[in-house]
Amino acid sequence: MAAAAAAAAQRLLAASTKIIGVGRNYVAHAKELGNPVPKEPLLFLKPTSSFLHAGVAGAAIEVPGPVESLHHEVELAVVLSQRARDVPEASAMDFVGGYALALDMTAREFQSAAKSAGLPWTLCKAQDTFTPISAVIPKSAVANPNDLELWLKVDDELRQKGSTSDMIFKIPSLISYISSIMTLMEGDVILTGTPEGVGPVRPGQKIKAGITGLVDVEFDVQKRKRSFST
């Protein structure tokens, strides 16, 4: 039974059509970047081409040439089990198929420029390898997703440690709100926000991150090697 649930959970990501990010969903993180605390979820989209699956040989987070400040953001990812549209908050958890540990890699100087100009966050959030993600943890294996410890280290230095209990908007609220705006499909991923402690990584460094007691991942960071010459 457990093996079947695990196999079904892994298949969800293959069906994913989009990644929905939630910004500033932890008060301390909003404040550390000098941002106001939102009164409703702040959403942005990432393409599934930004996924970087943990455990794949040779997989590494790539720092594109123009990026000078690539930041790590550790997050709980929620993976949808079925199509969801206009879902009431009371039944929102029925649409969850599993969870994962994810990183929302962010080109911070691109984000700062976009915010100043009132532009979308595509350049800073959507590039290849900018959504490293673990295997999917079946919903049945997570007793309380609103009380999970997230952590992240860079070269064994602890950078981030926080609890999903500190999220401003909890999972049922996020699913209900997002599904009132856009239809969520089976396998779609919601990145629920990051606790404080975000910071830069450089080529040659190693990121380790996890959900305590459930999963941990490890990714090398390298400079992107383009497949064409100019």
UniProtKB/Swiss-Prot annotation:
Q: Where is the transit peptide?
A: 1-26
SS bond partners: none
A Gene Ontology term for the protein's cellular component: mitochondrion
Q: Which reaction does it catalyse?
A: oxaloacetate = enol-oxaloacetate
**Residues annotated to bind Mg(2+):** 73, 75, 104
Cofactor comment: Requires a divalent metal cation for activity.
Do you know which InterPro entries this protein is assigned to? Fumarylacetoacetase-like_C, Fumarylacetoacetase_C_sf
EC identifiers of the protein: 5.3.2.2
Output the Pfam families linked to this UniProt entry: FAA_hydrolase (PF01557)
The cofactor required is:
Mg(2+); Mn(2+)
Q: What class of enzyme is it?
A: isomerase
- GO molecular function term, any single one: oxaloacetate tautomerase activity
Keyword Disulfide bond recorded: no
Its localization reads: Mitochondrion
Q: Quote the PANTHER family the UniProt record gives.
A: ACYLPYRUVASE, ACYLPYRUVASE FAHD1, MITOCHONDRIAL
Q: Which family does it belong to?
A: Belongs to the FAH family.
What's the protein here called?
Oxaloacetate tautomerase FAHD1, mitochondrial
Gene from which the chain derives: FAHD1
